[in-house]
């Protein structure tokens, strides 16, 4: 999932390391969905266009769903390039959530580069960096400090939320439309009552405990008629 725009980009005016004098294309990267018990982990890579400013960029966690949706469309329309990627539940269970998050971010940067937008510098939210073929650095709380990372956090969050809303259509009794897979009391109650779906992360302790009792949901058609 990507879109690019061919345009010359000068210094972006974002937070940069002091060792970088001029960055023509700064790529912000962030992920969404490390903590949930269900669903993929998503990541996005964004290179903003300094000639097309986007007002209201901020850490996706402090924005309302409506604001995120509006900004999602503006980012996709205004950015020089962007790419959204994910790592599946199966990959999360196979290599653990940290490495799956790194994989999703790596895929996002690779997808951006494959579309023709080659970053000079990649800045990643957090304290760890994925392996990419470009200069990369981690920025703690980068989603609140660097506009390109804020934009990436919004794309990743909205894309993941949309995926969980699709799961809600298949499994309405789990309440994915309200908790989006995160470990809330409502989600724990649904797991205890209905068991784990194929979309739950089996390596996560609350899900593993349910599975150990043989509580498995395999088909969405088994949902209660309400």
From Swiss-Prot:
GO terms for cellular component: cytoplasm; ribonuclease H2 complex. Pfam families: RNase_HII. A divalent metal cation binds at residues 30-31, 125. Its cofactor is Mn(2+); Mg(2+). It comes from Cupriavidus metallidurans (strain ATCC 43123 / DSM 2839 / NBRC 102507 / CH34) (Ralstonia metallidurans). InterPro entries: RNase_HII, RNase_HII/HIII, RNase_HII/HIII_dom, RNaseH-like_sf, RNaseH_sf. The lineage of its organism: Bacteria, Pseudomonadati, Pseudomonadota, Betaproteobacteria, Burkholderiales. Its main location: cytoplasm. PANTHER family: RIBONUCLEASE H2 SUBUNIT A (PTHR10954), RIBONUCLEASE HII (PTHR10954:SF18). Manganese or magnesium. Binds 1 divalent metal ion per monomer in the absence of substrate. May bind a second metal ion after substrate binding. GO terms for biological process: DNA replication, removal of RNA primer; mismatch repair. Belongs to the RNase HII family. Residues 24-216 form the RNase H type-2 domain. It comes from the Bacteria. This is Ribonuclease HII. The keyword S-adenosyl-L-methionine does not apply. Its EC number is 3.1.26.4. Keywords: Cytoplasm, Endonuclease, Hydrolase, Manganese, Metal-binding, Nuclease. It is found in: Cytoplasm. Endonuclease that specifically degrades the RNA of RNA-DNA hybrids. It catalyses: Endonucleolytic cleavage to 5'-phosphomonoester. GO terms for molecular function: manganese ion binding; RNA binding; RNA-DNA hybrid ribonuclease activity.
């Amino acid at each position: 999932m990507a879109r690019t725009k061919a345009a010359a980009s000068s210094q972006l005016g974002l937070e940069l390391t002091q060792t970088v004098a001029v960055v023509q294309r700064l790529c912000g990267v962030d992920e969404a969905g490390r903590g949930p018990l269900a669903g993929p982990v998503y990541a996005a890579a964004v290179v903003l266009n300094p000639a097309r400013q986007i007002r209201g960029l901020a850490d996706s966690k402090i924005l309302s769903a409506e604001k995120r949706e509006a900004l999602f469309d503006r980012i996709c329309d205004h950015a020089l390039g962007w790419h959204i990627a994910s790592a599946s539940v199966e990959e999360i269970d196979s290599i653990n959530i940290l490495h799956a998050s790194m994989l999703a971010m790596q895929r996002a940067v690779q997808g951006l580069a494959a579309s023709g937008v080659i970053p000079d510098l990649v800045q990643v939210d957090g304290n760890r960096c994925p392996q990419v073929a470009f200069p990369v650095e981690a920025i703690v709380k980068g989603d609140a400090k660097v506009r390109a990372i804020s934009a990436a956090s919004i794309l990743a969050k909205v894309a993941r939320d949309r995926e969980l809303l699709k799961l809600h259509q298949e499994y309405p009794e789990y309440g994915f439309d309200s908790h989006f897979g995160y470990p809330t009391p409502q989600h724990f109650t649904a797991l205890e009552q209905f068991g784990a779906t194929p979309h739950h992360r089996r390596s996560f302790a609350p899900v593993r405990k349910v599975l150990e009792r043989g509580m498995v949901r395999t088909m969405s058609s088994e949902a209660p008629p309400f």
